[in-house]
Amino acid sequence: MDVGNINHLFFIGALLVAASILMSSLSNRLGVPILVIFLAVGMLAGVDGVGGIVFEDYRLAFVISNLALAVILLDGGMRTRTATFRVALKPAFSLATLGVAITSGLTGLAAAWLFDLPLLQGLLIGAIVGSTDAAVVFNLLNGKGLNERVGSTLEIESGSNDPMAMFLTVALIEMLLAGQSTFGWDFLLSLLQQFGIGTVLGLLGGWLLLQLINRLSVADGLYPLLAVAGGLMIFALSGAIGGSGILAIYVCGLLLGNRPIRNRHGILHMFDGLAWLSQIGMFLVLGLLLTPSELLPIAIPALLLSLWMILFARPLAVFVSLLPFRSFHLRERLFISWIGLRGAVPVILAVFPLMAGLENAQLFFNVAFFIVLVSLLLQGSTLAWAAKKAKVEVPPSPMPVSRTGLQVHTTSQWEMFVYRLSASKWCVGAALRELKMPPGTRIAALFRGKELLHPSGSTRLQVDDILCVIGHDEDLPALGKLFSQAPTRGQDLRFFGDFILEGDARLSDIAALYGLKLGEVDGNQTIGAFMAEQVSGNPVVGDQVEWNGLTWTVAAMETGEVRKVGLKFPEGDKPGPQLMF
């Protein structure tokens, strides 16, 4: 390749990335996921689009997509809090294993019938599209305000279910190549090997990488690069010795993100950019790889297969997988059933049969791509609507304008949070000494206009003041309440109810105040303990219980315990003024 061709390649690549970024603003206007925009740019630049670029290198696409997926999972793992495992780990694992198997099997049976294929080839299509996609789920759920049980379950499931789909895909390809028609014990052993090696190597490699980052003294900009390089080494090593590289790098990210690590914010900041670049690059390449005209002949059976998977296979898999977990309400199960988002992973897996030279491999690829398009357009674009209908949304916690890590020592967890005070903030007009700051936090600076003030305890806050507060991540909820808008009936109260009660209020006192009947309920029990008992011991903000004809909603959690409960009366039956216990 001469210099001129290299320059053309660089220019076209940069142009496609820039076009994807510029067109991403259309996502909100059109009501479609931003990843669909990236995919559309690739398709427009491809062989059937205005660009006319002919790209048929499946191996290169496979390499690029795997690299991008690894980076996305490493970033997603670092941002997943292990505290959510309290309510989400077991159900997510059930969905990632049993759920994928059921979805793949039912989808495969339908594929064999719709496309008149041998059973094993139909099951191969089911395996290819059997898992949800981490890149899509992390992207679409970010900032949507889902309750912890639902949001964390979907995120952990998407980060851990790819090994099952990949294992089923590879196993079925090997069976088709060998002419086998039955599963043996080695099938189960191989599955255990994939999960076992991936998990162990992710934990061990993540721990070693953490120690290296915390002990090594280099330029700040090199720590994120070291984290990425280490994660990719773990990803590659796990795959080379028979484990799941996808699971290994996700577990590695989990460990790095939940332990004190040097230059945490620098790493996360760079990871954010790398994850976006990976998503753009991956969906651009997959868009270039697709020939839209080849989808038309299979459109009707592929659409029927998509609807079968979305409306029957996925819901049945979810309901069966979540049977042991009583804490999931029906509406939460229905929402999880609907948000079975497919993305790049099915397309990556669909490249396997092409590289293996299987019969009907191009059909498998086109069907997988069609299902991904339907999933992104149908499920992705209706996520917010479905969350509202299923009542799994909770009011988002107020967040600072910006936050920056303070590298006080090697594994410092100190941060600086910046808040701008608008007229609706209830702390406006208060003196600094009157603010009930969380223990261990300090106001480091106060800006008024362009001036840095030297405040005292008597300094009163004004509209448009900018406060710089030093604290820890766990202080954000309290700081958010302190520097947030004053609560109104149109905001938190509309969701949580008419009154907000303290979690340690006794049921007997509440019953006496509101004229409720305790029945067989222990009056000495606190309302917080009562709520936890009613939702099978793992409550999350947004959980609702009907008792005495009233709606009780978990309004705040702390260290796994219910701290505040919202009480909502039926319309037209609200006694007295609002009370705060």
Swiss-Prot record:
Q: Which SMART domains match?
A: CorC_HlyC
Catalytic reaction list = K(+)(in) + H(+)(out) = K(+)(out) + H(+)(in)
Q: Which GO terms describe its cellular component?
A: plasma membrane
What Pfam families does the record point to? CorC_HlyC, Na_H_Exchanger, TrkA_C
**Topological category with respect to the lipid bilayer:** Multi-pass membrane protein
**Classification via InterPro entries:** Cation/H_exchanger_TM, FAD-bd_PCMH-like_sf, FAD-bd_PCMH_sub2, Na+/solute_symporter_sf, NhaP2, RCK_C, RCK_C_sf, Transptr-assoc_dom
Listed transmembrane segments? 3-23, 34-54, 58-78, 87-107, 109-129, 165-185, 187-207, 231-251, 280-300, 303-323, 334-354, 367-387
Q: Which UniProt keywords apply?
A: Antiport, Cell inner membrane, Cell membrane, Ion transport, Membrane, Potassium, Potassium transport, Transmembrane, Transmembrane helix, Transport
Gene Ontology molecular functions: flavin adenine dinucleotide binding; potassium:proton antiporter activity
The record's annotation in SUPFAM superfamilies points to: FAD-binding/transporter-associated domain-like, TrkA C-terminal domain-like
- Role noted for this protein: K(+)/H(+) antiporter that extrudes potassium in exchange for external protons and maintains the internal concentration of potassium under toxic levels.
Q: What is this protein called?
A: K(+)/H(+) antiporter NhaP2
Organism equals Stutzerimonas stutzeri (strain A1501) (Pseudomonas stutzeri)
Q: According to the entry, what is the taxonomic lineage of the organism?
A: Bacteria, Pseudomonadati, Pseudomonadota, Gammaproteobacteria, Pseudomonadales
